[in-house]
């Protein structure tokens, strides 16, 4: 077991890769009664086409990672959630576009819940009947999101941008993909993506790391696993063009909502991707928030409302720049976004405002070291992406005004989609 201490942030954690390949990270928080353990696989909603070392490809229906997450809690001989509750632990799980994670937290003994977490995640117990039953539950969940205007706006925006990329699908897939999913597909996907050599376990606790690690070793030694067959997401060949330059539809709302989104070039290097994201995000804040002297006028004139925001998402095979609001003045908002993008590319950075923003984000990152959930998911995401967790935090502090200008000037914003939700008449 290797001990690692980051002097700048005064944080200590221990790492070990077990014989079966499971990567274990124990973040030591002395003096805390609470413990949190998260077990994750880099199987997310974007993993619809995978490839092994021999070049064999495997395709899955959209939403299969989310479907598996639902089924993992189902065991024929026990109720996993009730078992965690009986031991005084809260258990949950989530699927994102890049990973699936299962976790519990407790202020009591961790021995029982930790063994249960390892055991239930490392065993899939499904039947044809249980899979068919789950389909109705998931479809109902997807239909619920379809009725939520905010979720629908984002989903329709991605569908307007992407021809082939899995971002055009909801994390849960769609009704057709869910209905077509079979038990055999779920089992094959599980076998390829839930091997210990693919997964990671992160624990954040004030309890003795050596005792915890020994329990994990003991649990894993008692199990047999097939040899690991490394698998990875197959790269997506996505056209630079968008699917729909304009798209409008109606929902049961009172004020129109719209999104203006640009399809950006991807960035393969993980740390460079993070740096570019932060540069763009800081530029968005400087130009499209209350830091801009014009912001109050936009509000007063009704061009934007309290429902307003901007975001950026860069991946190894995708990129999105997004602005959205709720307004009657949809044309004026489109023109405003054009102006903001021009400002970002010719930005004269106010150094005081930039330092204030950096301090806010960096302070938030440092405060997240007090959140067990943030530590676990942050470490897992950085590890799966291939960069050091603390290096990701250091990037914010290192960004300069010229970095922001250089990145924003390099953006190609010609591939754009506008999506509008209008009130039903």
Model-assigned labels for residue ranges:
Residues 1-79, 187-297, 417-425:
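His/Glu-rich zincin catalytic helix
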Residues 79-231, 269, 275, 279, ...:
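Charge-rich, well-structured scaffold segments of protease-associated domains
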């Amino acid at each position: 077991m290797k001990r690692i201490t980051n002097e700048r942030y005064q944080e200590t954690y221990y790492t070990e890769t077990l014989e079966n390949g499971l990567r274990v990270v124990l973040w030591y928080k002395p003096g805390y009664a609470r413990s949190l353990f998260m077990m994750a696989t880099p199987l997310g909603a974007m993993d619809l086409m995978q490839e092994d070392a021999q070049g064999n490809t495997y395709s899955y229906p959209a939403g299969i990672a989310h479907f598996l997450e639902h089924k993992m809690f189902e065991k024929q001989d026990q109720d996993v959630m009730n078992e965690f509750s009986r031991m005084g632990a809260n258990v949950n799980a989530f699927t994102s576009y890049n990973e699936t994670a299962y976790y519990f937290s407790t202020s009591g003994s961790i021995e029982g819940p930790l063994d249960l977490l390892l055991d239930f995640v490392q065993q899939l117990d499904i039947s044809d009947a249980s899979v068919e039953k789950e389909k109705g539950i998931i479809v109902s969940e997807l239909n619920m999101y379809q009725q939520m205007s905010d979720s629908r706006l984002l989903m329709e925006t991605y569908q307007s941008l992407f021809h082939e990329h899995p971002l055009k699908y909801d994390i849960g897939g769609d009704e057709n993909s869910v209905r077509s999913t079979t038990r055999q597909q779920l089992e094959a996907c599980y076998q390829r993506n839930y091997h210990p050599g693919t997964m990671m376990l992160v624990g954040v606790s004030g309890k003795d790391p050596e005792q915890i690690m020994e329990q994990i070793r003991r649990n894993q030694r008692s199990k047999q696993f097939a040899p690991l067959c490394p698998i990875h997401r197959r790269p997506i060949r996505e056209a630079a063009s968008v699917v729909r330059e304009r798209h409008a539809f109606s929902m049961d709302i009172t004020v129109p909502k719209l999104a203006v989104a640009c399809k950006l070039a991807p960035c393969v290097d993980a740390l460079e991707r993070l740096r570019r994201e932060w540069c763009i995000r800081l530029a968005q804040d400087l130009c499209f928030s209350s830091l801009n002297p014009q912001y109050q006028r936009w509000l007063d004139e009704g061009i934007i409302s309290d429902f307003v925001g901007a975001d950026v998402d860069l991946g190894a095979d995708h990129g999105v720049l997004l602005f959205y609001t709720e307004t009657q003045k949809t044309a004026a908002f489109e023109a405003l976004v054009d102006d903001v993008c021009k400002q970002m590319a010719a930005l004269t950075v106010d150094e005081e405002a930039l330092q204030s923003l950096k301090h806010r984000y960096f302070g938030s990152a440092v405060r997240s070291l007090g959140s067990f959930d943030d530590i676990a998911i942050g470490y897992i995401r950085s590890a799966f992406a291939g960069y050091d967790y603390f290096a990701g935090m250091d990037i914010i502090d290192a960004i300069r005004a010229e970095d922001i200008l250089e990145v924003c000037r390099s953006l190609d914003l010609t591939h754009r989609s506008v999506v509008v939700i209008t009130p039903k008449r």
